[in-house]
C-alpha cells in the first residue's frame, strides 16, 4: 500500500500565521482540527490528532503536524517523505530553539541529549503516532512537550529530534529574521493577552522555586521579600497549573 502524506494542524480560530499556513504558496492542503472548540490545554492537540488518525488514517500514512498559529511552509514539500525517511526513525520532532535560556528550557523539559524536542512541529507514521499520543494522554502532566521529551529519554527508541533542521526549524525569539532552509518553519509565538496569561499559568509550576529565590535575593529587606513571596505563593496556589509538578 502506498502511504499518504498529509499536513495537519490544530487551531480553534484564525490567529497569527494561520491564514498563511492554510493558504500557502505551494497549494499544500492543510487539515485543520479543533476549529471552534474551546482551548483546554496542550493535550487538546494530542486528543484531536489521535481521534483523526483513528478515524481516517492507515498505519503507513505519514502525518506532518504543525502549530496552527506560528508555522509557515517555507519550501516546496515535494520531498517530505524522502527527507523524513533519511532520519531512520518512525517519529521526528522539531528541535526547540531554547530562545530565552538554555537553563530555563532544561529546567522545564526533560532532556538526555544536546537537544530538546519541541511539540509545535513533528512528523511520524500513523502507527507510531498512535502509540505516543495514547501514552501522552494517559499521563497526569498536561504539557505535551514535557511528556514527549520524557518519552524520548525514557520510553521509545523510534523517536528522533530534527537536529539537522532539514524538515523543521523553530526560529529563536532573538533571531527572528533568520533565513531557514527547512520545509516547515515556526516563528516566535504570536502572543495575545490570553495566550500570554495562559503561558504564565502553565509554566509557573516549573519556575516557582527559582522565582522565590530571585525574590529573596533581589529584596534584602525581610518584610518586603516575605510579602512578595506570600503574594506570589497565593498566585501559584490559586492559578497555576500543577499537573506536571514533581
Question: Model-derived features: where do they sit?
Answer:
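Short beta-strand-to-loop acidic/aromatic patch adjacent to the donor-nucleotide binding site
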Residues: 61-69
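N-terminal anchoring/stem segment of glycosyltransferases
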Residues: 1-62, 214-243
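A generic structural motif
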Residues: 30-39, 93-97, 161-168
